[in-house]
């Protein structure tokens, strides 16, 4: 009888462990979620600066859309991370803090150029690539679905960034 209880207990423990592990995404998926959170926070904070300090109306309009879109992405990301038990970083991270500090020291046209250098086409292309890779390769189906859902939004961000940068050169 005791052997049977032990066997049942071990079987239940193994099933419970498998369930717990199934709920947590693969390390690469968790890393994607964390990196997306850091990058999103940078996009929000740099774009909020651009709304305040930007000189060109095209830049301000781009920045406002980036804030709105990235807030929606952030909300979906936070919900997914909570469901997957992934702790997301708070704020944009050390590397992004330095860029934000440097950016906030700029004024007028110099600010607009610096903002587009930091949050413009190159940055948006990198984000798009990151999400495309997760959309194709994430092990967790929910992480993959999230990335797939956001790819069109990030494609639009990249297109707008290219258009805004081009408008500054005119």
Regions found by a protein language model. Give the residues of each.
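His/Met- and acidic-residue-enriched segments that coordinate or traffic transition-metal cofactors
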Residues: 2-11, 15-170
């Amino acid at each position: 009888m005791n052997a049977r209880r032990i066997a049942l207990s071990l079987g239940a423990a193994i099933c419970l462990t498998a369930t717990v592990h199934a709920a947590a995404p693969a390390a690469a998926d968790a890393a994607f979620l964390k990196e997306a959170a850091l990058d999103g926070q940078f996009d929000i904070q740099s774009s909020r600066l651009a709304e305040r300090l930007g000189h060109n109306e095209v830049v301000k309009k781009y920045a406002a859309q980036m804030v709105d879109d990235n807030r929606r992405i952030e909300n979906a990301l936070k919900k997914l991370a909570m469901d997957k038990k992934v702790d997301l970083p708070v704020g944009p991270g050390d590397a992004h803090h330095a860029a934000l500090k440097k950016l906030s020291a700029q004024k007028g046209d110099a600010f607009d150029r610096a903002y587009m250098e930091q949050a413009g086409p190159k940055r948006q292309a990198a984000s798009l690539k990151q999400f495309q890779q997760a959309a194709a390769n994430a092990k967790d189906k929910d992480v993959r679905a999230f990335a797939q859902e956001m790819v069109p939004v990030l494609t639009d961000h990249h297109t707008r960034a290219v258009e805004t940068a081009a408008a500054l050169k005119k």
